Design a protein with these regions (language model features):
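Alpha-helical subdomain
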Residues: 2-196
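Compositionally biased, intrinsically disordered low-complexity segments enriched
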Residues: 52, 202-205
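Cationic, low-complexity basic patches in intrinsically disordered or flexible, solvent-exposed regions
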Residues: 192, 200-203
Length: 205
């Protein structure tokens, strides 16, 4: 309960409403044009705040009230559209700002970035640009973080959608290259923690 949540690239995510009373303050961070759309549909008040800035702009942290509380940073659906330099910049800002932070970051494998096209973004100019093989490889890029573990998107699909599971609980989807290469979730342990959608990586400082 005594935790601040920072949801980077929040879009129209509504978890902040479903998890009320389980955090001290919740900050949704996204680009100004995205926040304008969010404001049309979702009114923020109480412990929920909007910050219309890029996660690579360190000044976004100046708009937060922070007094050393535990922090959970959620980064979903973003890293695969950035350059490696941008990803490292984003994580560096988190590391330097918060004392006790857990980061959940969604990542994609380089294979998926190179060979898979996402139908949901075909009409836009967005494209996959960066991926990392696994959480341990990500940890090597951000040595201030300690690797804790990772979870594949397919594992979650097993529980949510029975059709993806075999008779003995094995994932049929995992045998298909497209799904087998989907983003994993990784955990790290150091002052900061980071996690992602496809792969969740947890980093702690």
């Amino acid at each position: 309960p005594n935790t601040i949540v920072v949801n980077i690239a929040s879009g129209l995510d509504t978890r902040c409403y479903r998890m009320q009373e389980k955090y001290v303050r919740w900050y949704n961070v996204d680009l100004p044009e995205t926040m304008k759309i969010r404001e049309k549909f979702l009114t923020e008040n109480g412990p929920v705040y909007q910050i219309a800035k890029s996660a690579m702009d360190a000044s976004y942290t100046n708009e937060m009230e922070y007094g050393g509380e535990n922090v959970l940073v959620i980064i979903e659906g973003l890293s695969m559209y950035l350059s490696e330099a941008d990803v490292l910049q984003m994580l560096s800002i988190i590391e330097k700002t918060f004392q006790n932070v857990t980061v959940m970051i969604e990542t994609m494998s380089p294979f998926v970035v190179k060979h898979i096209k996402e139908k949901s973004i075909e009409g836009s100019h967005a494209k996959f640009t960066w991926g990392v093989k696994n959480g341990k490889n990500l940890q090597r890029l951000v040595p201030a973080f300690t690797y804790k573990g990772e979870v594949s998107l397919v594992e979650g699909m097993k529980k949510m959608i029975p059709i993806y599971c075999g008779k003995e609980g094995s994932s049929e989807a995992g045998r298909i290259p497209y799904y087998a290469g989907r983003r994993p979730r990784t955990k790290f342990d150091f002052k900061c923690v980071c996690s992602t959608k496809t792969k969740q990586v947890e980093l702690r400082i």
